[in-house]
Amino acid sequence: MAERVLTRVHSLRERVDATLAAHRNEILLFLSRIESHGKGILKPHELLAEFDAIRQDDKNKLNEHAFEELLKSTQEAIVLPPWVALAIRLRPGVWEYIRVNVNALVVEELSVPEYLQFKEELVDGASNGNFVLELDFEPFTASFPKPTLTKSIGNGVEFLNRHLSAKMFHDKESMTPLLEFLRAHHYKGKTMMLNDRIQNSNTLQNVLRKAEEYLIMLPPETPYFEFEHKFQEIGLEKGWGDTAERVLEMVCMLLDLLEAPDSCTLEKFLGRIPMVFNVVILSPHGYFAQENVLGYPDTGGQVVYILDQVPALEREMLKRIKEQGLDIIPRILIVTRLLPDAVGTTCGQRIEKVYGAEHSHILRVPFRTEKGIVRKWISRFEVWPYMETFIEDVAKEISAELQAKPDLIIGNYSEGNLAASLLAHKLGVTQCTIAHALEKTKYPDSDIYWKKFDEKYHFSSQFTADLIAMNHTDFIITSTFQEIAGSKDTVGQYESHMAFTMPGLYRVVHGINVFDPKFNIVSPGADINLYFSYSETEKRLTAFHPEIDELLYSDVENDEHLCVLKDRTKPILFTMARLDRVKNLTGLVEWYAKNPRLRGLVNLVVVGGDRRKESKDLEEQAEMKKMYELIETHNLNGQFRWISSQMNRVRNGELYRYIADTKGAFVQPAFYEAFGLTVVEAMTCGLPTFATNHGGPAEIIVHGKSGFHIDPYHGEQAADLLADFFEKCKKDPSHWETISMGGLKRIEEKYTWQIYSESLLTLAAVYGFWKHVSKLDRLEIRRYLEMFYALKYRKMAEAVPLAAE
């Protein structure tokens, strides 16, 4: 048997050099094609199109050195003749940079700062030799443990538990942080877990053994109060459990950890420690209310997410508190902006109880300036000058409401996460970040060309706020892997913040590490009271059917519905979203309009935008104009129905099921979707679903089994895929049932609020513990962020114009 020889892995530069040496003419021909584009940025599809355009013989020669594979890994090419620089993504979170001189055929490796400096020449012309502010967060996390495998990305808590269980409990001294952690637990002056009788780890172990011996003799259902005083005398307080059985489980788990620690036991033990009683959730922008707001500008999936999240979270908190043997009432406050002029909604009401919850409320605090309260709605892109004063007011309001500090602060979206960072910093509380969507990935090249976008979107403030929040927070929740680190071919939202530049402002050489164990994938679900299968006939809300029939099929055209459906026998192709550029509803209408086969098979119904009132949102105005033009140009009346945004979520659930009755399908055609809550809703109702392959839906749907992926950048192909599906269903009705059932099964396995709530509270416990035992106040990075906030962000925010009243 031949001896196996280990060979050195060649660097990227060496591989390109080898290709150059072997095939100079072919590589020169290709690079000349790239250079001919002139100064600018080429995207992956443009690079591959140029490669496809060269002769097959030349391609074959270059592929001897896997040149096409290298190109497929290239996320952008910067062309500044005679130089072409490539940003090559070897795998998620791992990048290298090179540049090639087309004239001299010389290859250079570039560091991140060198690549970004080269890229800045697109904007600045000659390289700016003056001092440029470089942001580098890597030194602050260099000593923290991190996984290195791609499969570990988004499983931060698992990695952290393995690390903690390996590092701790190996001798008496290593147990001290745990002892201090258990002794630190109290609520409004009441001691929990351990009292002053236990001063060291030896005493703790002895007490636990005594407790174990005593508990074994008791009937499992014995309530805690029957042995409460006995336990107090030996040093144990409330919080271990409500019955002898549960207390014994906790005691045995801790003894097992002290004897032979393992990550699963550690996570289970930490998840049962009483830690979270008061939660503050920040979501300032948009119209945040429970009725009559969905479809308003900046008001969509995030509002639904939080209103579904909170009742489920409260239920899990109540369950855990009961099982811990405590009589504490938890509180959840959703903090948003008070809008005095939002007529017809509760957005002007200071406090509002959350439906489906007993101890959760929406707390509204107004934006203020020196002139007083800001009364009107403000776009999410223009909130930045108000945030600092808003948080000062919020801190006072939540203190008055809770009469205590929150135990966990959860931010949502950019400004909510900045607010959470400021509040957590002020109060010294564990912080959780939920981005929902990071705008930098939605708008290509919005970093390098930020000045073009800033007047309208103020991305300089927003991207800076995102950087501050993601580096300040204790842990980050995402709905999908793609949100963090993309896929084999696409860059993740957080990954896009690893390195970028905004010329004239600053250069980010290390913004975030996607391998950081603060990242955790915790996917939401749909409210099971509103969204359930069309086949559950006994639960169906048939009282809504006359209204839904009117909405879909009436011959009346008005502000609520435009155009009519002439053939009621055809299935309905359905979509529902905000009417903005990224959601791409007009794109779907155009695909449909230009595909005669699809038009012959199905009717198209679009729910989005509000034609009942004049929109203040510029994007919505532009999309409305485009929609009217498509209807007129393609003569869609008769096959198409445009319905204004529907705000009744209960009826919307039945609307999905009503569409399913027609053997229709749901389409989510967005250019990018961070998660895709409507995708989950539609699948939960048994409606076959087609959704964008850019973002979260690519993970929610298993293509061909529980739905279908579509590429919004190739609308013709997407329309053909839809037509193929409906043609197949026409010939074989069981195909529709197969995809419907596949979607329902997928949801049941992965996307429920119960799974979500259990995970979130366990994360809060583990990261709270990690923060304590590692003395992880992260003072150094927080000081760095304070300076960045005060010297850079604040000036940007102040430059955003205040809204006219």
From Swiss-Prot:
Pfam hit, one: GT-B_Sucrose_synth
Signal sequence, start to end: none
Keywords recorded for this protein, A-Z: Glycosyltransferase, Transferase
Catalytic activity: an NDP-alpha-D-glucose + D-fructose = a ribonucleoside 5'-diphosphate + sucrose + H(+)
Top-rank taxon, per record: Eukaryota
Electron transport among keywords: no
A GO biological-process term: sucrose metabolic process
GT-B glycosyltransferase: annotated span: 275-752
Keyword Transport tagged: no
Tissue: Expression is at least 10-fold higher in tubers compared to photosynthetically active tissues.
Annotated EC: 2.4.1.13
Intrachain S-S bonds: none
GO MF term set: sucrose synthase activity
Purpose of the protein: Sucrose-cleaving enzyme that provides UDP-glucose and fructose for various metabolic pathways.
Family designation: Belongs to the glycosyltransferase 1 family. Plant sucrose synthase subfamily.
Protein name: Sucrose synthase
Native source organism of the sequence: Solanum tuberosum
